[in-house]
Amino acid sequence: MEREKLWVTRLTWRVSGEHIDKWKGIVKYHMRNRLQDWTYLMHYQCGWAWYTCSRFLIPLGGEGKIVVDCYWHLTPEQGWLSTYAVAISFENWQNTYKTEVTPDVADHMIHCHYFPCFTDRAIQQAIRGESFLWCTYKEGHVAENHWGQVRSLQFLALTVYTDFLRNGRRKRFQGKKTRMVRNLGSQQGAVGRMIKRHGSRTQSGSTTPFWERTPLPSMELLSGRRGKEWGTNDRKGL
């Protein structure tokens, strides 16, 4: 008995085929290194998923997974045989719950599970008062504040330090021993330099990332909402 085709409505972002290919290249590069539990499915592996050219499965621990579907040959009745789009959803492992998610929310979920903001070396640099940096996965911070800015490590350290002064020093030594860091100097040393540099001005931040390193597999880039880095996005939804 032939299976009947079922039509569903999905939230999608219209992009070019070249845009999808570049994003796939980024994902495959990271899948060879740190994202080995991500799964890539070709169109013939997606079963009865009509118009699906490929699919990515991104596990999020025991909660569920993010499913990224890449579509092709959409709206053939209008002659758009080369039209591509992407859709992002979250599903639990029991397949009893599924919901569409926006690229910024998906980036936030992926960031929390796979990409820590700062390495141990970056934290040591901040303690010494050196000027460091930003989280390399900026897209995962869109939900953190109104402007989507990523807080610098110095700003976060200064916030913790001021909270420590406000709440009292005794709490620092309760419960467990504190790891000492060498070369901190006096109170006018590393912390003092950091306060002078960051305490009298507003937090710095930017919605534009630095691309010196290999780009990370951001859903914002895939959906075209940050497509001007590649120049292939028309920013149209279907």
UniProtKB/Swiss-Prot annotation:
Region entry Multimerization, spans: 159-175
PTM remark: Processed in virion by the viral protease. Highly phosphorylated on serine and threonine residues.
Principal cellular location given in the protein's record: host cell
InterPro entries: Vif
Modified residues (Phosphoserine): 152
Localization, UniProt: Host cytoplasm; Host cell membrane; Virion
Stretch list, region Disordered: 188-214
Protein name: Virion infectivity factor
